[in-house]
Amino acid sequence: MDKGKSVKSTEKSVGMPPKTPKTDNNAHVDNEFLILQVNDAVFPIGSYTHSFGLETYIQQKKVTNKESALEYLKANLSSQFLYTEMLSLKLTYESALQQDLKKILGVEEVIMLSTSPMELRLANQKLGNRFIKTLQAMNELDMGEFFNAYAQKTKDPTHATSYGVFAASLGIELKKALRHYLYAQTSNMVINCVKSVPLSQNDGQKILLSLQSPFNQLIEKTLELDESHLCTASVQNDIKAMQHESLYSRLYMS
């Protein structure tokens, strides 16, 4: 038997993933530091201006202390955040590995059509566009041909979908990309709670510490989900996001 054919046959039978479309022009870039940088609160995409409905919960006295803030976070993370943010990140990451631009754009279209609150649709689009433009402004970073093609074609990017394409394009492992994104976005939610409820800084840190086990469960759950679960969202959170549009006073854009 031809050894070359045997090796190729074995690769197909075990379902080996295709090579990550990583560019060789980034030999000077340390992905460990880069993933910290793009998930940092100072990465200029404007995340701090959005609460994604949380401000309504606070003004309606649904979130008033550490306990209710933790309850809100667990509910939000295990519903809307899991089935929209985390799952879309995974789907676009996997599609980027296959260089399937059509599927990525399809995922983004589903999210746009499934997001009822106007403020959330606008927030998703603004954060996604800002994430892409900020990466492109980093001239030392070569994102590769596929990411550049995606950046030109996408009409409704979100932070999660563009981040998924980014991570795949630079060869960042999926589980690591999910872990950093999940922690960073949850940390933003906790900061909003600390500022707006308000909570003490110590309470904020206690909340983050208590979420470590749920974090691991959410990541494992994300890896099990497929496209049929995309945007299985929380109706309650959509309602609060819509109510946010007519709040008398507000600190956040959503």
Swiss-Prot record:
Q: What is its main location?
A: cytoplasm
KO phenotype (gene knockout): Cells do not express urease.
- At the top level, the lineage of the source is Bacteria
Q: Which GO terms describe its molecular function?
A: nickel cation binding
What sections of the sequence does the record tag as coiled-coil? Answer: none
Residue span of region Disordered: 1-26
Biased composition annotated in UniProt, kind: Basic and acidic residues: 1-11
Q: How does it assemble?
A: UreH, UreF and UreG form a complex that acts as a GTP-hydrolysis-dependent molecular chaperone, activating the urease apoprotein by helping to assemble the nickel containing metallocenter of UreC. The UreE protein probably delivers the nickel.
Q: What does this protein do?
A: Required for maturation of urease via the functional incorporation of the urease nickel metallocenter.
Name of the molecule in the record: Urease accessory protein UreF
Q: Which organism is it from?
A: Helicobacter pylori (strain ATCC 700392 / 26695) (Campylobacter pylori)
Organism lineage reads as: Bacteria, Pseudomonadati, Campylobacterota, Epsilonproteobacteria, Campylobacterales
